[in-house]
Swiss-Prot record:
Quaternary structure and interacting proteins, as annotated: Interacts with MAVS.
Name of the featured protein: NFX1-type zinc finger-containing protein 1
GO molecular function (one): helicase activity
Induction (record text): By interferons (IFNs). Expression is induced upon viral infection.
InterPro entries: DNA2/NAM7-like, DNA2/NAM7-like_C, DNA2/NAM7_AAA_11, P-loop_NTPase, SF1_C_Upf1, ZF_RZ_dom, Znf_NFX1
Zinc finger residue extent: NF-X1-type: 1291-1313, 1375-1393, 1433-1455, 1463-1480
PROSITE patterns: ZF_RZ
Polar residues compositional bias, start-end: 113-122
Gene it is expressed from: Znfx1
Amino acid sequence: MEDRRPHLEARPRNPPANHRGPMDGELPPRARNQTNNPAATNHAGRHLRASNHPAPFRQREERFRAMGRNPHQGRRNQEGHTSDEARDQRQSQNDTRRRNDDQEGRSHRPPWSSDTFQQWHTPPQKPGEQPQQTKRLGYKFLESLLQKEPSEVAITLATSLGLKELLSHSSMKPSFLQLICQVLRKACSSRIDRQSILHVLGILNNSKFLRVCLPAYVVGMITEPSPDIRNQYPEHISNIISLLQDLVSVFPASSMQETSMLISLLPTSLNALRASGVDIEEETEKNLEKVQAIIKYLQEKRRQGSLRVDTYTLVQAEAEGEVESYRAMPIYPTYNEVHLDEKPFLRPNIISGKYESTAVYLDTHFRLLREDFVRPLREGILKLLQSFEDQCLRKRKFDDIRIYFDARIITPMCSASGIVYKVQFDTKPLKLVRWQNSKRLLYGSLVCMSKDNFETFLFATVSNREHEDLCQGIVQLCFNEQSQQLLADVQPSDSFLMVETTAYFEAYRHVLEGLQEVQEEDVPFQRNIVQCDSYVRNPRYLLMGGRYDFTPLMENPSAMRKSLRGAEALRHPRINVFDFGQWPSKEALKLDDSQMEALQFALTKELAIIQGPPGTGKTYVGLKIVQALLTNKSVWQINTQTFPILVVCYTNHALDQFLEGIYGCQKTSIVRVGGRSNSEILKQFTLRELRNKREFRRTLPMHLRRAYMSIVTEMKESEQKLQEGAQTLECTMHGVLREQHLEKYISAQHWESLMSGPVQDADWVCVQPSKHSMILEWLGLGVGSFTQSASPAGPENTAQAEGEEEEEGEEEGSLIEIAEEADLIQADRVIEEEEVVRPRRRKKEENGTDQELAKMLLAMRLDQEVPGTTAGPEQATEEWETQRGQKKKMKRRVKVELRKLNTMTKAEANGIQDVWQLDLSSRWQLYRLWLQMYQADTRRRILSYERQYRTWAERMAELRLQEDLHILKDAEVVGMTTTGAAKYRQILQQVEPRIVIVEEAAEVLEAHTIATLSKACQHLILIGDHQQLRPSANVYDLAKNFNLEVSLFERLVKVNIPFVRLNYQHRMRPEIARLLTPHIYQDLENHPSVLKYEQIKGVSSNLFFVEHNFPEQEIQEGKSHQNQHEAHFVVELCQYLLCQEYLPSQITILTTYTGQLFCLRKLMPVKTFAGIKVHVVDKYQGEENDIILLSLVRSNQEGKVGFLQIPNRICVALSRAKKGMYCIGNMQMLAKVPLWSRIIHTLRENNQIGPSLRLCCQNHPETHTLVSKASDFQKVPEGGCSRPCEFRLACGHVCTRACHPYDSSHKEFQCMKPCQKVLCQDGHRCPNVCFQECQPCQVKVPKIILKCGHKQMVPCSMSESEFCCQEPCSKILRCGHRCSHLCGEDCVRLCSERVTVELKCGHSQLVKCGNVEDIKYGLPVKCTTKCDTTLDCGHPCPGSCHSCFEGRFHERCQQPCKRLLICSHKCQEPCTGECPPCQRTCQNRCVHSQCKKKCGELCSPCVEPCVWRCQHYQCTKLCSEPCNRPPCYVPCTKLLACGHPCIGLCGEPCPKKCRVCQPDEVTQIFFGFEDEPDARFVQLEDCSHIFEVQALDRFMNEQKDDEVAIKLKVCPICQVPIRKNLRYGTSIKQRLEEIEIVKEKIQGSAGEISTSQEQLKALLKSKTLFHQLRPEEFLILQEKLAQKNLSVKDLGLVENSIRFYDHLANLEGSLEKVHCGEQQSVRTRLEQVHEWLAKKRLSFSSQELSDLQSEIQRLTYLVNLLMRCKMAEKVKGSIAEEVSSIRNILEKTSKFTQEDEQLVQKKMDALKTTLPCSGLGISDEERVQIVTAMGVPRGHWFKCPNGHIYVITECGGAMQRSTCPECQEVIGGENHTLERSNHLASEMDGAQHPAWSNTANNFMNFEEIHRMM
């Protein structure tokens, strides 16, 4: 969490942006030497300098430097205030925070909320996780922290919510205070958790613990009587001093008062303790003196006024003439370096002797490395400053830097690593840049931005690079810490000059910081590296001896056993590693002599250097070394701790190769740290993958998991608030703001002037301003708006800067894929876990939010087709009748104006009375002033959220490092790129790898290698070749004259440190190796395997150099070169070699320049060249292939060969081929280089160079073809020669191609001639092309079909029996119809003839004859007869008999309703009894906005101020409230465009008609007063009709007595509703208010709806049977009731559904009492009702309710009847007939009418007595009489299997069997057990169980028990 002191308005001017200061991931030293800088000034680009700074600060700095902490991070809130003032404001903020904690919806506060950020927000808990500590930290808990690592203590305290509460107490026990000090000191000793420590110290700095408890404790020491306690005080005093030293270093300004008070008390306490005999350690007194010196120094600075903020840097003065210590040097360039051409102090890298000391060694490499990236920037800026007066500055090029003009810092953005900023620059000077390949603005590049000629400047690095954005001039930058502090005062309108240096700054930064942090004594191998002692010791871990097992390294382990002697072989395979005689043979290890020597050397020397010329197996030997070490890890590991092997490679590709080799012998415990891996095998070992594994997340310590949850929650909250404000800020750059958002920043006089419009002036024409934003009219952006007749001055009307850039042509998608150079470089730059910083938001969501925000804020948007208008869509065309070109021009003008820098000053603005009198240029200047104030205010509001998010992101980065530390500590092999090793140097210090292997060591700068090593390193193995590529340096002077390009590998070789060189090359055939030996390597022997290579096919020589003198072309951007002649030749040669049947994977094209790379790509379509690799030479070191085609590119009259003169590059280029190499270049020019001259001489001696390459045809060896240019390859079009192939194909034809070496057997050749084969006896020939397979003859011939005798045309190859006769079948089916199939087919089973049948519903319908029988047996048929029943609404039913369920459930009426709704729209829904709310877009609008809701929803009232004003009256109400001013009747004084007076009124929109020009239209009589000469008119805005004002006033204000409908007034002419007119606003608003009341009634009040919703929920819950039988429907209704925003209509639908479903459920439940045979038919009818009820509907129409009620009533009667009829078989005669007649009515398919119901009811009443519900065949009265007469309790009545009733007396339990007198079945039972076939007759007495049963014995029939008692 961030320090929570207030963010005050005062901005620090120091420390400056160019201060060395901390970068992300480090804390700078407190003591800095700034001797080069002048005294402190107010320039933000300069340093404070402290003179006479006391010396003791240096030692204290060492601990902070080693820790990598930045004491100034997060302390941005003490600016310009004393501690007392800060404390007061903190208290005020804490009060505010407590108030805010009680408020809900905190996350919805806008980003400009002034409330203090809620620091103590508790993150949500996951199930099963322990809750965060929210109570005071207890003694036991603090004691437990003392047992933990410092890192865990720091993170736990920073995450704990109880720390602040703990330190807020004003008194505590001494023992508790002492424990707190111990814990705090331990937390501050952590080396990698700087942000957590800063947070803890921030809480301590603002606590009563510091202000009250500690002083009281120190004073109490003086009077302590107990000797034992006094003797403990020195230790606690040491803790307090250490804490104070940390505190004053981090918060020098805000903590000084409390710290100085404590420091003044401590000497007195120490003297008192000393006087009482307590020993005080000398170190304690020294530390106290250091802090006293710091306090004294700070007090002096405070008196001078220079100590105002916590970002003040403590600096140390050096003795006069002393060289500035490199540890105090800033990494970034300083003000003096940029403005004064001072030569820095540099020492060359010593390559021929030893260094004076380790300090000098580190100093030398630090200065050289820093100068390598600073010098280009420094010299570039100096040249730029000298060129400022140059008129062609934008076109001028600078060698050292790239310049970007008019860069604007637009808005902050949240990323995973912190805050980044979107920066936009001018792309016009960069039209020719190909951003996909350009090295401009690559990830990690450093940029310097200034807006005042570099008097002050900001530093940033590129954090994200998308070439699509770069084309628009947009890049994301991450500013360094000092620059972040200055960003508070930067506005989006500020224009910067941005300068880029090409160096990968992030790599420099990490290494430079590492060199500053490392202590001299911690540099390993100093005796060899610094003192250059040639004696190399054995590794320390082998001092006690070491026995190694080499068995896994051997292909045949038995050889190992043979090589050991006697008993030794029997005991174990381990041997003494120092006794080379015991080692396995080189043959057993598969090594040559030099490789064997290298392996022995590497395993026995602590510093092993292995040089491997090309092809000698460097990587192979390196893997053998790693395998040996891993196999014998017990020798160099400690049992209690794991130390991984660290493998460092220069490139990602080399790292992948090496780790894949290790994977062959080690499948687990590998970790890869570097750029994105292209290896599928290694992806599982990347940090990202390992970190995301579930098992790893589970094993993370709890304190890290808690911290992660807390920080993620806070990050999300800060991000949300920041994004809202940032989007607002960005919107201001994309259009013109609406005036209401600027009102706060416009003076009252200017606002009134702006909104009133211009006074009468002949130069103005009139429009209707109410339709548009007034500010658009004022800025000249309205089309029919106030437009000055005179053209404005300035570039507004010119085409300057308005031309649109032409888009570059698209790349062809059919070309081979070549990684863009920018991508290649970036891939090596980006550490995988660092990743390119991308905004956290998804673009889709971002765009949606931005669009909504822009719509609200902007009156005109640059990304919109039509400028913003508040008018409805109907008026859009009429209002903006501008041509497309004019709109485009208008947008360009706005774009230009928004990017202009000239702004009106406030003083100038105050002198303006009428803003409409300004010319257009001045208006834009004034607008930019208002805009700047708006932007500044918005920027100020989001600043605190930036700081909060940045702090949380830094805390999160620390947590990630802790996670990574856990991963790396568990690994056995850690692979890193050099950049990754520098970045993770602090973790490597913790991991402490004992063995470090550096691959490609000769390519790595020495400083990079040293920064990789930790003091724990005991074994360093360097593998490389200094005669190939050297390390690359930016500055040529430093590389050559200061030996910066000499790697540690090369330097150690040159100072005679022992090394082993691999002597046998296993790659190149001898002819190719001859180019390297002896020209580059004196003695490089060929391994026998390279003597067995086959000759290259199709070429007379395996090695050849083609000479030419065709000139190169220089590529403007990128300083690269290309040679079209060479590119065409190489591509043609490549295609020729493919024709020789070489695989694409066997050929690689190399070139020396990137420009040539993309020239080649354009010539290589993927169809032909898929799989061919194309690379630049530098990216191909370490690689090899069978055939290499090399293009050297350079060819010019000046003889410039560029880096082709560098031996190392020549070595790499000539050593990549295994079997064949073909090179093309200007050899005459290259021969001027001595090395090339010698190589060319060797080539000439062997006839391997010449102007033409001799091709040799494989098929005709005597035929040779000379090729010197691409067109010559046309002589060998198919890769052979020009002779025809003449091969006779299997088909008998001749091959039509030219001679071709591929496909010699012609198996793949496709002969395209017509096939001539005879297919049948009739002589028919094959119609196919020759290569196609012949098919059976398909020529049709007449044949007689044997089965039927018909004559048919049958394919020649088909027999008569197989052919299906195509004649119609003549057979007659059983139904009498003819068979419809063909003669050859089986006859149809079901006749398809259509016949008419009568359906069950009574209708006739055509059906298939074959289905008639099935229909008789119940097959359902959908009757399509139209229903045509007249519905309740009067319209005919649109359904069919089937869809209307045979008239029982009619379909909804589909006729249009056409009724007029209250909103004046016609109902769009089909005919219903009750119209639903209108679903069209609401048409209500005002001058400010338009309602976007549905018309039937309640409108949100406009709360903007009412704009109805004129010179005489002004309304002061809100827009939605009734106006409080009268209408004005003063005639309008404006002139129309025609020059005649306006016929309108003051303050009203001027009517478009003229009394003079259109007299007929104006004076046309409507109300009767239009022809009067003084008549005044009003134009309705909704329809544009004009009316005489007095008549229209009466019309609008009259209220007819007989008018009962609530509706809007309409235009008397066209009946369009009058919705928008300021003059009649009160009347319109009154009508709208009435309409809103009606809407609310329709929708229902929220309270009523909520109550009804709860009641329905309770009702639904009570319907248990419904839930049980119909769970799906129950759940649907339950979910519906859980929804929000339900209307009354919705609830009505749900209520009806519940009641209907409940009734149906009851009916379904009653079916148990119905005979089984009858249940299915009823269930079918119930399912039909359910099916119909489940249809989607907004409500039930009256017709639907009627149908549903009728059907449910029918089913209720039917179920009741069937229940009565369960025993109906006993009912005889007339009763059975009566039952049958009732069932006929109830089971018919037509609707159950009212008459049916009356008849059924009457018949059912008659049956009650004869057919009771009991089913006993007796009436209920008779049943009651029988039960009463027997006098037995419930549960005594039973029935036999056939349902005959009998009674068991006494206890009710069956004690004997008998027979039923009716049916002779067994009744009764024995031993109180009833016969299984008998059952309880509950219908007699309602009993639920027998009287004698377990249930009865436990519970009995409760009513019976009650009666018996």
